[in-house]
């Protein structure tokens, strides 16, 4: 359904360096280009390009504060879309928000939102409590894309020369 008669766009991005470059260079092979498996991902013409999510507890370590910056892109002229964000815990809806966004053709639109989760279950290595953030794009009453981001509320800090996770 994504390849049609006429002109189609296939974009390939190759990163020469990454934060894993040092590990990959341990065998002293310094190659650039594509030398591993490649996957093609079909996306709708208006889609989620990137999502950056931060989830931390508040100062009392009781409630969770979630902030997200979602980048939307459109390849089909100017588009109006509704971004709906649902936060789930074990399949149950914890909180929800929605934001209307207008996207110009071949440009990106950045949408930001915040959520507060009362009595949030905090993530630790011993109790890896995760929430599921569902990001949905709706156009003309139809959901065209859904992306899931697993998030955990935690705060890691160094205080008084001690490494603390969630204040402990």
What are these regions (language model features)?
Residues 1-168:
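Secreted/periplasmic carbohydrate-active enzymes, especially glycoside hydrolases
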């Amino acid at each position: 359904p994504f390849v049609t008669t006429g002109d189609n766009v296939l974009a390939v991005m190759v990163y020469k360096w990454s934060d894993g470059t040092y590990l990959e260079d341990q065998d002293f092979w310094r190659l650039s280009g594509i030398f591993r498996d490649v996957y093609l991902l079909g996306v709708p013409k208006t889609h989620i390009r990137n999502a950056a999510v931060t989830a931390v507890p508040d100062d009392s370590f009781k409630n969770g504060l979630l902030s997200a910056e979602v980048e939307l892109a459109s390849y089909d002229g100017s588009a109006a879309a509704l971004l709906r964000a649902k936060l789930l815990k074990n399949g149950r809806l914890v909180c929800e928000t929605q934001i209307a966004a207008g996207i110009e053709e071949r440009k990106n639109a950045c949408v930001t939102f915040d959520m507060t989760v009362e009595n949030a279950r905090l993530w630790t290595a011993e109790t890896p409590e995760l929430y599921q953030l569902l990001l949905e794009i709706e156009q003309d009453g139809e959901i065209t894309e859904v992306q899931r981001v697993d998030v955990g509320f935690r705060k890691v800090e160094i205080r008084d020369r001690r490494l603390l996770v969630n204040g402990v």
